[in-house]
Curated annotation (Swiss-Prot):
Organism: Oryza sativa (Rice)
UniProt binding sites for ADP-alpha-D-glucose: 97
Protein name: Granule-bound starch synthase 1, chloroplastic/amyloplastic
Biased composition (Polar residues): 46-66
Chain's gene name: WAXY
Primary enzyme class: transferase
Role this protein plays: Required for the synthesis of amylose in endosperm.
Amino acid sequence: MSALTTSQLATSATGFGIADRSAPSSLLRHGFQGLKPRSPAGGDASSLSVTTSARATPKQQRSVQRGSRRFPSVVVYATGAGMNVVFVGAEMAPWSKTGGLGDVLGGLPPAMAANGHRVMVISPRYDQYKDAWDTSVVAEIKVADRYERVRFFHCYKRGVDRVFIDHPSFLEKVWGKTGEKIYGPDTGVDYKDNQMRFSLLCQEAPRILNLNNNPYFKGTYGEDVVFVCNDWHTGPLPSYLKNNYQPNGIYRNAKVAFCIHNISYQGRFAFEDYPELNLSERFKSSFDFIDGYDTPVEGRKINWMKAGILESDRVLTVSPYYAEELISGIARGCELDNIMRLTGITGIVNGMDVSEWDPSKDKYITTKYDATTAIEAKALNKEALQAEAGLPVDRKVPLIAFIGRLEEQKGPDVMAAAIPELMQENVQIVLLGTGKKKFEKLLKSMEEKYPGKVRAVVKFNAPLAHLIMAGADVLAVPSRFEPCGLIQLQGMRYGTPCACASTGGLVDTVIEGKTGFHMGRLSVDCKVVEPSDVQKVATTLKRAIKIVGTPAYNEMVRNCMNQDLSWKGPAKNWENVLLGLGVAGSEPGVEGEEIAPLAKENVAAP
């Protein structure tokens, strides 16, 4: 691709009144508010923000004086000088989501904006989002040997600029419900032009300098920004900054943080495709990768995630224990473990949307409650759940729930294999999820085999998911691996203890005997169901249902609900990591509260 010149980018950082200041380089290592997590064995976990052999923090002598900023009066935010932060990702809830990536880009940015930072999120426009307007800004992006016209759409929600990249390759493929059509026509099937699609995203994101002032957009973010890239879809972005912009004096002081949400998806493509990225030869070694697996291309490939890790200024992931797993070896680092041991990686546990998931206000549950009224209310919600699921209504029967995407990572096959042993107990099981057809059939077969004790719902059903959280006694999370996990946070928010595998963020967030039960680590081999794993799941769930209804169980319910599971703590940890990059003008935020996240003006309308 031809390099950009300053004249091609109409705006610059001058509108911010930038002077120099010294950026702090310390990393706040503070955990989540509430119960202190510990390992399944009972020892204290270090914290929920931990760094493993991280790069040295850059020391830059810079300072900033930022002019005043104005936000709509419907939401009140803290007014610190803050940072200019631009998140880039393939998903952004609620407009688009297949899993945790969408949740993070939906929830973390508003939490950072509440602390006074100016925050933008850039993601593809997969649908005709009715709350996003056409900015009329058009850019031509070179992909392979042709140019593509790309437009910007924008909306301002919860203090965050939401920018959507508009191109037919996004909009024409995903129509109506986005779901799993974002990456392919069906689960596990990728679009053949995904490399071109997400190259557009990576090249278009830095063009935010071209966005114009208007009543809904308060002007350029300038060049002194922190880009936060997320997963393989954004892996080439730091290379494009170095190749196309910085040699021409643009984004010279910008920094890039790269966040890994799931190491299993790396963006591996044929090595011969590298020229289509229009990057110079100097970046080829960062993409170059010898693949030990056989899909999608055998042997030598380009690896987008590898390039993102190597070319960024800081590498993060979504929980401290997952960070440790990623550098532990090939099995859990998926052949990039050696790279991450070189660069270092920081784990910060995710938060959750406590406005959407709030048992005291949830419109989908029969009886609303808080920590003081949870015991009786959950029993009433259990009866409503049993009736809704077509199971015998009896509040004294322990009820286990499984909610998740039906794919190997989440362990639906392991869960199904454990059900026959669980049927020896007086227990009911509700299974909810969609995904691979073979797993949908497997769960339905459990219902057919054990009518009156097992109910499987293999379709998207948000109201039922909320009722399950409120009515279940135990939430089963038998994940083979789990970078952070959201389901256990939602369960604990509703006072439902989790019986979970001891992996990733489940270790950081679920405390054995306090807020849940640990099964131990399960095998990451997705091709087989290990008998030992089935036994771990069955044994742990039987251990859990034995205490349902006891004073010890009631105490666990209260422990779960008395935690702060919001994005507030994680946002502060993210702030301190990004401040450590030393971007000119970056200052700590001032702790603030988002006053009206559910106000009409702030509710997304995808």
